């Protein structure tokens, strides 16, 4: 008999800043720097494998893997305005906190795999199994920072009614920029409640083959 042991480790960090998002009708080119976001990955993985040869006709392979992925998606933390409530002025400007931020997710994997190979006469058989345990936690705070939408605002909504519509022009409506200057949002959206959740997944697989 003989044994061969293999160990492997991987680390993969990544950080991307200045991301422009087009969700919720945000067109590229109209997002201010404060509306950009940043995404961070921190991936770590390790594997240990033992290959056990038993005589000339039997081989057992056992492998354990641990892997962890940490994901963070945040509003712009480089300037104070990145955490302010989001302001949408369609056709003109989008600034303040990115509505989809922040997101935090951690996925961990524990994997156990064992395969046994056996040669008997003209048959080469192999069977084994695989068990995974994957706990996951996630936080998703869409619109939790608050979103103000500014659009056109009718003059009639402010009490400006044309007393003689047949002879006098109507009062002009406020443009989205004028509505923002007047502090008159058309809507306000705010996410509420617990944004966090956690769950686990346990996939199990077995196989047998003969050739």
Set out the residue ranges of the language-model regions.
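Short acidic-glycine motifs
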Residues: 1-211
